[in-house]
A protein has these predicted regions:
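Glycine/small-residue-rich loop that forms an oxyanion/phosphate-binding "nest" at active or ligand-binding sites
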Residues: 80-142
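A Rossmann-like FAD-binding core segment of flavoenzymes
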Residues: 6, 73-98, 103-106, 167-264, ...
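Beta1-alpha1 glycine-rich phosphate/pyrophosphate-binding loop at the start
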Residues: 2-76, 147, 159-185, 200
Length: 310
């Protein structure tokens, strides 16, 4: 089947905070802008219960913030298309972005595809996904009312979601491979003060146990080598992120782990190809840093296209 051809100025891939802000800035610069997203606009923001560190809001739910961003992104006539980008071709000044049914020809491309939660890679994880194993407390927490839950990880996401889950669970046990948390102090203090949260230190999950549903986990102490079982009906996993950069893997713009390498202007080594948000090689991945990236990328795409007129 021949694909539909769409000619545009800028293609933004992804509709998370970075992508929506990039679309806002590009379309506001009077560029014909198409924003492609395979899921619900907002990305991981939709999976966040409460956002308390985004300027302009003392407290806002993730989905509500995403809706505000989407309205802004569409304000200057950007086009929102649903689709899953398979690959990108770069031929000089022309870029071709492919989905299953369309080909977009653009002068500039902004990759804002974000990241997803890393899996543990242990027995039982894939088999029990959706049957007690989860990566989204906001999505699935309600199903564990009055049950015991394990949260794996020690960073911001793990600690924040552990606290969130206590409104449903009878007990939340945080299992962390180190002897101290990596989360921000305000999140640590909140977790340590919560009587429903317990901690198991210096331990890793070796297996998720259960036949038809999660029944617990087998853990190993990394210092002593001792193994033990912890009973629970749910396991929520927050052990880092993986870049969602499959569509650009052949372009030579990523590091060995798949994060896209850019300069401070969000430009990659390919002229006219930019990246923004969590898919970038960067230190801090937050909503506010993603929107900053997106604004910069949208503006720099405009600047780049202006140079093509010379």
């Amino acid at each position: 089947m021949e694909k539909e051809l769409i000619v545009t100025d800028v293609v933004v891939i992804g509709a998370g905070p970075a992508g929506m802000t990039a679309a806002l800035y590009a379309s506001r610069a009077n560029l014909k802008t198409h924003m492609i997203e395979k899921g619900v606009p907002g990305g991981e923001v939709n999976n966040t219960a409460d956002v308390e560190n985004y300027p302009g809001f003392s407290l806002v739910s993730g989905p509500e913030l995403a809706q505000h961003m989407y309205q802004g992104a569409m304000r200057f006539d950007a086009v929102h298309d649903y689709g899953d980008v398979s690959h990108i071709e770069v031929a000089g000044d022309l870029k071709r972005v492919h989905t299953s049914s369309k080909v977009y020809e653009a002068k500039a491309v902004i990759v804002a595809t974000g990241s997803f939660h890393r899996h543990l890679g242990v027995p039982g994880e894939e088999e029990l996904a959706g049957r007690g194993v989860s990566y989204c407390a906001v999505c699935d927490g309600f199903f564990f009312r009055d049950k015991e839950i394990i949260v794996v990880g020690g960073g911001d996401s793990a600690v924040e979601e552990a606290h969130y889950l206590t409104q449903f669970a009878s007990k939340v046990t945080v299992i962390h491979r180190r002897d101290e948390l990596r989360a921000q102090k305000v999140l640590q203090d909140r977790a340590f003060a919560n009587p429903k949260i317990e901690f198991i230190w210096d331990s890793v999950v070796e297996e998720i146990l259960g036949t038809d549903a999660v029944e617990g986990v087998q853990i190993k102490n990394v210092k002593t080598g001792q193994t033990s079982r912890v009973d629970a009906q749910g396991v929520f996993i927050y052990v880092g992120l993986v870049p969602n950069s499959e569509a650009v893997k052949d372009l030579g713009i990523t590091d060995q782990e798949g994060w896209i390498i850019t300069d401070d202007h969000m430009a990659t080594s390919l002229p006219g190809v930019f990246a923004a948000g969590d898919v970038r090689q960067k230190h801090l991945r937050q909503i506010v840093t993603a929107t900053g990236d997106g604004g910069t990328a949208g503006f720099q795409a405009y600047q780049y296209i202006e140079t093509l007129k010379d």
